[in-house]
A protein has these predicted regions:
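Single, function-defining residue in the core of a domain
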Residues: 1-54, 69-70, 80, 91, ...
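Helix-turn-helix DNA-binding helix
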Residues: 73-76
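"Short basic amphipathic alpha-helical interaction patches in structured regions
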Residues: 60-62, 127-134, 170-171
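Generic structural motif
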Residues: 66, 114-116, 277
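Short, charged amphipathic recognition helices of the HTH superfamily
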Residues: 51-65
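Active-site-proximal, Lys/Arg-enriched surface segment
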Residues: 79-158
Length: 473
């Protein structure tokens, strides 16, 4: 579908009357369509907000949409607090049905690559948020417990080839990765049923229950292996063997530990599990800054292992490693975009309902922006050498004319062509082996960065001869 049609469908979803039952906590809410902030205004406001304060967001958003006086800050906060965040899941469901399923999709050897991962979003330091979402605990220093800021766990399922967020959850920080993964897969079951799928996940998602579930549904998977998985079978593998198949019997006692009934019943009928084990070896040099300010190169060796059920005839050892380390990394990049460019941790209240709405709305915006970026990437004349500058695309999608056109559903063909050309014009060079440096970044002063670095806000600093450098310990 053309970009204009995709955006018009997306806008019609935001304005759909089907959303009203899902948006109401109080039955009498959002009944007036002639007020300053009916439901469609509130949803668009939350999706496109970008300021550093509530006042800035209101002043940016309302003059572009109507000639009436903007609502007060108290009115906006009140509307946010009575908006049921289930409405964002309904919007996502309609997006999948009306946009994702009909769209032409990129695949790898006929497979969709669906990555699942989670991150933490730092919340305002308020006792209610600490109770609702939890706080980080310090096992090494119990005296710090209760003093860390609250944080919510954000989990998404992401189509890495098509750059589409398929499902999202915002939950308590202590919720484990595996239950969230199953929740994603259950939500997407009808969406993925007609496709060949490869599930990509890191080491915290692996389980016999997941592997047998994928076997039931016909899904393929690539999961980073933990060292304590299938010890007996792995010990029998010849040390120099880098690609083999493990045959694992799930015995009766093991079956009793399976949580989901339908998977347990399936395992009781088919107790043998065939898991492909792939081994990879990496060597690289890393440069560190010593306390004297000198640079020291340290040579690292790393052995990594992966579980999969893909056939070796279809995907060889190098293919598996490439998919995991290259393609799966897009979900990490997506989280970086949400935290640094979309500013998902910029929150205007300590109300847990409002905070959940603010976070989920920016995830919806990410899908709108990805539609524009994908169209611009198709116009990229040198795709192997350059990428469209995502920051520039986000700025254009937040511009006044785009917000006004999206809200009114009057999307000019000429203006959209200009938008795509401008997005494709500003590009960044692809430099192999280059990555964002997290540790040993030099600083001449101590400052408090707003965003996290590798999951840490305000990472530890070590004192060096000429200033400071970030540290991972």
């Amino acid at each position: 579908m053309k970009l204009r049609k995709l955006l018009k469908i997306f806008s019609s979803i935001i304005h759909s009357r089907e959303l009203f039952p899902y948006a109401r906590i109080i039955p009498s809410s959002f009944t007036r369509e002639d007020g300053k902030m009916p439901l469609r205004y509130l949803l668009n406001y939350l999706i496109f907000r970008q300021g550093m304060s509530l006042s800035e967001d209101i002043c940016r958003f309302y003059p572009d949409l109507n000639n009436i006086n903007p609502p007060s800050k108290q009115a906006v906060l009140k509307r946010m607090s009575i908006l049921n965040y289930d409405v964002w899941h309904k919007i996502q469901q309609m997006f999948l049905e009306r946009i994702y399923l009909p769209m032409k999709k990129k695949t790898m050897k006929g497979y969709l690559l669906i990555a699942v991962d989670g991150t933490f979003a730092t919340l305002p330091n308020h006792p209610v948020l600490g109770s609702i979402f939890g706080r980080k605990t310090h096992s090494n220093d119990p005296e710090k417990n209760g003093h860390s800021p609250p944080q919510a766990k954000v989990s998404i399922a992401y189509d890495v080839l098509n750059k589409v967020i398929l499902d999202f959850q915002v939950v308590h920080q202590d919720i484990s990765e595996i239950p969230l993964l199953f929740k994603h897969l259950e939500v997407l079951e009808n969406v993925l049923k007609d496709y060949k799928v490869i599930i990509l996940a890191d080491r915290y998602y692996g389980s016999a229950e997941l592997f047998k579930y994928c076997e039931m549904k016909g899904y393929k998977y690539i999961v980073r292996a933990k060292s304590n998985f299938f010890k007996k079978e792995r010990a029998a593998v010849i040390p120099k063997c880098v690609d083999t198949v493990l045959h694992i019997l799930i015995h009766k006692m093991w079956q009793k530990r399976i949580i989901r009934d339908h998977i347990r019943r399936y395992i009781s009928i088919y107790p043998i599990m065939h898991v492909r084990l792939i081994k990879g070896h990496y060597e690289y040099d890393e440069e560190h800054i010593t306390t004297s300010g000198n640079r020291k190169t340290i040579h690292h060796q790393l052995d990594a292992e992966y579980f999969s059920n893909l056939s070796s005839d279809e995907f060889d050892t190098e293919d598996i490693i490439h998919i995991y380390h290259t393609e799966r990394w897009d979900i990490e990049t997506n989280y970086g975009t949400m935290k640094t460019l979309l500013d998902i941790e910029q929150l205007n209240t300590a109300n847990p309902i409002s905070i959940t709405n603010e976070i989920m709305a920016k995830i919806i915006f990410a899908n709108i922006e990805n539609l524009v970026r994908n169209t611009a990437e198709d116009k990229n004349c040198r795709p192997g050498e350059h990428l469209v500058n995502n920051k520039h695309v986000i700025e254009l999608c937040r511009s006044s004319w785009f917000v006004r056109s999206f809200f009114s559903r009057r999307l000019s063909v000429e203006k959209l062509k200009e938008l795509v050309v401008e997005c494709a014009r500003v590009r960044v060079m692809i430099r192999e082996g280059r990555h964002y440096k997290r540790w040993d970044k030099f600083r001449n002063t101590v400052h408090q960065p707003h965003h996290r670095i590798d999951g840490r806000k305000n990472p530890p600093l070590k004192i060096i001869k000429t200033g400071f450098a970030t540290s991972n310990h």
